[in-house]
A protein has these predicted regions:
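Alpha-helical segments flanking ligand/cofactor-binding loops in enzyme cores
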Residues: 1-2, 84
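Glycine-rich, positively charged active-site loop/lid region within alpha/beta enzyme cores that binds
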Residues: 2-71, 135-140
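Extended hydrophobic/aromatic segments used for targeting, binding, or gating
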Residues: 111-141
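Structured helix-beta-strand junction loops
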Residues: 6-8, 75, 128
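Conserved short secondary-structure transition element at the edge of the structured enzyme core
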Residues: 13-17, 45, 51-113
Length: 141
């Protein structure tokens, strides 16, 4: 993000919900259709590994989501917190989440109008990211 800001380049974030992981709706028992990339590309078998769950192993992602749940501010959904988090970075000009239903579009869009996350929440998410996400994915970028 720092380099983009230095060069005055905006960042459009793709997959800010990590293929749905950050909606909080999946469980270890979740099953994806055979033609869903979350079923057939978990280890990058068909295309870039980072396209599925942002490069994380599904079980690792589920564990991280459970660690995030206590941080969700009152009045926010997990989805909204995840989107609000990425939009808190000054270099990010737009987040492009996917949606299958109209109500998901509304929930996604409303995240931009929610109050900023507290510095304490941002710090806890940052610590979780550095500890649990960065070691698994940054070598792919």
């Amino acid at each position: 993000f720092k380099q983009a800001q230095h060069k005055r380049v905006g960042i459009l974030t793709r997959l800010p919900l990590s293929s749905g992981l950050l909606t909080g709706k999946f469980t270890p028992q979740s099953i994806f259709a055979g033609d869903d990339h979350r079923a057939f590309n978990r280890r990058g078998e068909a295309f870039d590994r980072g396209e599925t769950f942002s490069g994380l192993d599904f079980q690792t992602g589920l564990r991280i989501v459970e660690e995030l749940r206590p941080l969700i501010p009152s009045g926010f959904s997990m989805t909204q917190m995840a989107l609000r988090w990425i939009l808190m970075f000054p270099a990010v000009t737009c987040a492009i989440p996917g949606a299958k239903r109209a109500e998901q579009v509304g929930e996604n869009a409303s995240a931009a109008d929610l109050p900023p996350l507290s510095e304490a929440t941002m710090q806890k998410i940052r610590e979780l990211y550095e500890r649990e996400v960065r070691p698994h994915v940054h070598q792919y970028w």
